């Protein structure tokens, strides 16, 4: 399927060709001047549309991850990661009810185990995960995501997650984590963290 950028799509919807324009109050801009008849033939300044945050494709793990690592190792990883989160600057995101927190961790472990090819425990209990929607009540910024991933590296190392499937698991959570950002704090795109940049830490 052909993909369009936002500016191209808007131009096609309006059915007008855009040109660079100059406005006495704004100077020369990268905005586009559209001849819109409903404005009496006057040219209007239109700032081009652009994507604020582009989500990369998310490749889920194959069932090889569950076969090699084992469901219990995946669950151990999720629990260790959340133990680190609970004792990190991200703890306020989860509230003060530690009992509720660990109950939610069990559901998260179900989801990760199922996503990696394990039993469908999560969908049997909760149905579709709707991850982005479920995270909307919490403020998650770019730097929160980066710390979340840093702690994942530490958790992978601490539980000795099998290196032969660590990259497959990492590429899933690294890309997926971008979709959890719901409060922009910079115009720069989220930092990508390829597996090759963290692999050496897992061998320590």
Model-found features: residue ranges?
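Core of compact, soluble alpha-helical bundle domains
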Residues: 2-204
């Amino acid at each position: 399927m052909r993909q369009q950028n936002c500016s191209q799509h808007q131009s096609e919807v309006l059915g007008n060709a855009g040109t660079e324009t100059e406005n006495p109050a704004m100077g020369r801009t990268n905005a586009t001047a559209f001849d819109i008849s409903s404005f009496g033939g006057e040219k209007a300044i239109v700032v081009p549309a652009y994507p604020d945050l582009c989500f990369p494709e998310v490749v889920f793990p194959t069932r090889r991850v569950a076969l090699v690592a084992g469901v219990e190792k995946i669950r151990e990883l999720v629990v260790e990661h959340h133990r680190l989160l609970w004792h990190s600057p991200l703890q306020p995101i989860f509230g003060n009810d530690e009992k509720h927190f660990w109950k939610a961790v069990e559901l998260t472990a179900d989801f990760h185990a199922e996503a990696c090819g394990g039993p469908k425990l999560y969908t049997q209990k909760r149905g579709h995960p709707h991850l982005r929607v479920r995270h909307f009540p919490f403020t998650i910024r770019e730097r929160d995501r980066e710390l979340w991933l840093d702690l994942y590296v530490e958790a992978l190392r601490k539980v000795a997650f099998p290196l032969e499937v660590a990259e497959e698991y990492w590429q899933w959570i690294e890309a997926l984590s971008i979709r959890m950002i719901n409060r922009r704090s910079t115009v720069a795109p989220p930092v990508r963290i390829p597996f090759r940049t963290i692999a050496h830490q897992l061998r320590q």
